[in-house]
């Protein structure tokens, strides 16, 4: 019996090959397989947001005006979350709530779930796009891995947190002032600024900004002069073999400033990747904890002493009183459907009163 060994070749391309050729063709804007997820989802998410902020009221869900049509501006317009009574309904246009009525769907807050879900999948599609392009040009996938940080924050804040609460109502609405309101809510109801995961997130984001500024300034300061113009930006070839700036000079400078400095570019740039991405991951993890109503730091001994001694206060006890004030004022305004009424005697007061 004869066994023939050889590479199997198809006589003609099947549908997958044809699609693969078209999707991954070299063009001005790369499409790719990831584009099948990215472009439709990004289009619908942005389109839903522009539609909602332009035309759709939040009167039926929050008792608020939230569109340009009602007199809002860019900072106050928003696509608002559904009412608390709708819990975690996906609010599909053809679902039992709207029953195919587009106007009713908008009134119920259907655009929020539409924007949130398409936005989440659009971000995932963008990360897959970075994976796909990195593989095509034989790069490492660290860009895509880094982008998982913003995705983790978006998913934890807009999806996981409200899933842990009573409904989508408690997620942020998609608007500038709406996000500010949500931040105040997080502080008042969760004491978010004293949460160690928030602290790690702040350290990561601000630390990354510091590293970025230091790195950019250092590279600019140590550029090799390679042109007769005052501006050296165009004096270098993207395919050049030699260095554009002097790592040795930069190392010597920062060694004199701090006593320590990065000795190679790999560790330096990995650190610049590690700091912000880890900060974003940690803050996302903290929001998942808040979804389960986990507490931040509680310094109970200080609270007890402040309650017993009118002359004893710390910045912590003052912040706790501020949080009580946020809850007392915000709950009644933010959740009108609960008909919350707080008597004067339960409203927070400073220890000196």
Swiss-Prot record:
It is found in: Plastid, Chloroplast thylakoid membrane. GO terms for molecular function: chlorophyll binding; electron transporter, transferring electrons within the cyclic electron transport pathway of photosynthesis activity; iron ion binding; oxygen evolving activity. GO terms for cellular component: chloroplast thylakoid membrane; photosystem II. The modification Phosphothreonine is found at residue 2. The chain crosses the membrane at residues 41-61, 125-141, 153-166, 208-228, 279-295. Gene3D superfamilies: Photosystem II protein D1-like. Its EC number is 1.10.3.9. The keyword Flavoprotein does not apply. It is a multi-pass membrane protein. One of its GO terms (biological process) is photosynthetic electron transport in photosystem II. Chlorophyll a PD2 binds at residue 198. It catalyses: 2 a plastoquinone + 4 hnu + 2 H2O = 2 a plastoquinol + O2. Keywords: Acetylation, Chlorophyll, Chloroplast, Chromophore, Electron transport, Iron, Magnesium, Membrane, Metal-binding, Oxidoreductase, Phosphoprotein, Photosynthesis, Photosystem II, Plastid, Thylakoid, Transmembrane, Transmembrane helix, Transport. Fe cation binds at residues 215, 269. It holds the Pfam family Photo_RC. PROSITE patterns: REACTION_CENTER. Belongs to the reaction center PufL/M/PsbA/D family. Photosystem II (PSII) is a light-driven water:plastoquinone oxidoreductase that uses light energy to abstract electrons from H(2)O, generating O(2) and a proton gradient subsequently used for ATP formation. It consists of a core antenna complex that captures photons, and an electron transfer chain that converts photonic excitation into a charge separation. The D1/D2 (PsbA/PsbD) reaction center heterodimer binds P680, the primary electron donor of PSII as well as several subsequent electron acceptors. D2 is needed for assembly of a stable PSII complex. PSII is composed of 1 copy each of membrane proteins PsbA, PsbB, PsbC, PsbD, PsbE, PsbF, PsbH, PsbI, PsbJ, PsbK, PsbL, PsbM, PsbT, PsbX, PsbY, PsbZ, Psb30/Ycf12, at least 3 peripheral proteins of the oxygen-evolving complex and a large number of cofactors. It forms dimeric complexes. 2 of the reaction center chlorophylls (ChlD1 and ChlD2) are entirely coordinated by water. This is Photosystem II D2 protein. It comes from Nandina domestica. The lineage of its organism: Eukaryota, Viridiplantae, Streptophyta, Embryophyta, Tracheophyta. The gene is psbD.
């Amino acid at each position: 019996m004869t066994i023939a060994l050889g590479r199997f070749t198809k006589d003609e391309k099947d549908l997958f090959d044809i699609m693969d050729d078209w999707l991954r063709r070299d063009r001005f804007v790369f499409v790719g397989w990831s584009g099948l997820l990215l472009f439709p989802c990004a289009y619908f998410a942005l389109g839903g947001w522009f539609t909602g902020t332009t035309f759709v009221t939040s009167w039926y869900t929050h008792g608020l005006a939230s569109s340009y049509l009602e007199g809002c501006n860019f900072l106050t317009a928003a696509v608002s979350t559904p009412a608390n009574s709708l819990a975690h309904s996906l609010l599909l246009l053809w679902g039992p709530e709207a029953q195919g009525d587009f106007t009713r769907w908008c009134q119920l807050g259907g655009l929020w779930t539409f924007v949130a879900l398409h936005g989440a999948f659009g971000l995932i599609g963008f990360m897959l796009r970075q994976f796909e392009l990195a593989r095509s040009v034989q790069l490492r996938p660290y860009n895509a891995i880094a982008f998982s940080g913003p995705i983790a924050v978006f998913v934890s804040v807009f999806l996981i947190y409200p899933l842990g609460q009573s409904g989508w109502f408690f997620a942020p609405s998609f608007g500038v002032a709406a996000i500010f309101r949500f931040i105040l809510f997080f502080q008042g109801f969760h004491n978010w600024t004293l949460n160690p995961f928030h602290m790690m997130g702040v350290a990561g984001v601000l630390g990354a900004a510091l590293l970025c500024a230091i790195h950019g300034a250092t590279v600019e300061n140590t550029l090799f002069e390679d042109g007769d113009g005052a501006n050296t930006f165009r004096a270098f070839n993207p395919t050049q073999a030699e260095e554009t700036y002097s790592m040795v000079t930069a190392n010597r400078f920062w060694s004199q400033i701090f006593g320590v400095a990065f000795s190679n570019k790999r560790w330096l740039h990995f650190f610049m990747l590690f700091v912000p991405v880890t900060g974003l991951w940690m803050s996302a993890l903290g929001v998942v904890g808040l979804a389960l109503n986990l507490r931040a730091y509680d310094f109970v001994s200080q609270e007890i002493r402040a309650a017993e001694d009118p002359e004893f206060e710390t910045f912590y006890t003052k912040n706790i009183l501020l949080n009580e004030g946020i809850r007392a004022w915000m709950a009644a305004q933010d959740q009108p459907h609960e008909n919350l009424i707080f008597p004067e005697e339960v409203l927070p007061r400073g220890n000196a009163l």
